[in-house]
Design a protein with these regions (language model features):
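Loop/turn-to-beta-strand initiation segments
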Residues: 55-57, 107-111, 146-155
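Substrate-engagement module of ASCE P-loop NTPases
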Residues: 87-99, 131-155, 181
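N-terminal pre-Walker A segment at the start of P-loop NTPase domains
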Residues: 1-18
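Conserved P-loop NTPase "ATPase switch" module shared by AAA+ and STAND
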Residues: 103-132
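Conserved ATP-driven motor cores of ASCE-family P-loop NTPases powering translocation/secretion/packaging/pilus
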Residues: 157-221
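Conserved lysine of the Walker
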Residues: 39
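Mechanochemical coupling/switch segment within NTP-driven translocation systems
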Residues: 57-61, 68-114
Length: 221
């Protein structure tokens, strides 16, 4: 599926050259960027590209009830606000059920998209630390093991602080940092990037850097 466009080709030749991924091999995504960097538009574009190529059992947790995803409100596995707890739990239970099946018997992908996951975890940490730890472990299990059963998780957030992910950030098969101007050293480190990975030019809305497992680093737009 189309994952992004290569910024280097666009800047030099004004040619759209796609960065492509196999979502069955790389099903999980960490999409980060400050407010106004283009995350919502990018997410909708990525979701469209996925659905064009794959039959997907889609779960969507819109924690802050963003109007960008209201078009999904009639979808049976669409959750907002506090109901995201239910959605996350049900997806995890589904993941456990899939583990009981043979890999060859699974005919479609299963993806959980969780918008503003850190805000969700932060609230849990403030109200019930044990519950927050449970959800953090659930995410780690999904990222570590669900790929074998055609499943994964897309997390969308402004900052990928380690307190929200424990050690599971490294298990995202695809990582995107969208940035306007020049990203901070801290925001780069959160996704495993360094300043040496950046171009000399500033980045515009919808542009940034990405890592694809098995392919490496890309400058994207």
């Amino acid at each position: 599926m189309k994952f992004a466009y290569n910024k280097l080709y666009w800047d030099k030749y004004h040619e759209k050259v796609s960065v492509k991924i196999n979502p069955l091999k790389n099903p999980s995504l960490l999409l980060t960027g400050s407010s106004g960097a283009g995350k919502s538009y990018s997410l909708k574009w990525l979701l469209l590209n996925l659905l064009v190529e794959q039959k997907v059992n889609l779960w969507f947790c819109n924690y802050k009830d963003s109007c960008d995803f209201k078009f999904l409100k009639l979808h049976e596995k669409y959750y907002t606000g506090e109901a995201c707890e239910e959605g996350f739990q049900k997806f995890y239970e589904y993941f456990l059920e899939m583990q009981k099946k043979s890999e060859d018997s699974i005919t479609q992908m299963s993806i959980l998209i969780f918008d503003e996951y850190p805000a969700f975890i932060l609230r849990q940490q403030n109200e019930d630390k044990k519950k927050a730890e449970k959800y953090t472990r659930m995410l780690a299990d999904i990222l570590m093991f669900f790929r074998s059963y055609k499943g994964g998780c897309w997390i969308i957030c402004q900052r990928a602080d380690s307190q929200y992910f424990s050690s599971s950030r490294e298990n995202f098969h695809n990582r995107i940092l969208l940035t306007r101007g020049r990203p901070s050293k801290e925001s780069l480190q959160m996704l495993g990037f360094t300043k040496d990975d950046l171009l000399d030019t500033k980045y515009n809305v919808g542009e940034g850097i990405a890592y694809v497992d098995g392919q490496g680093l890309f400058q994207i737009k």
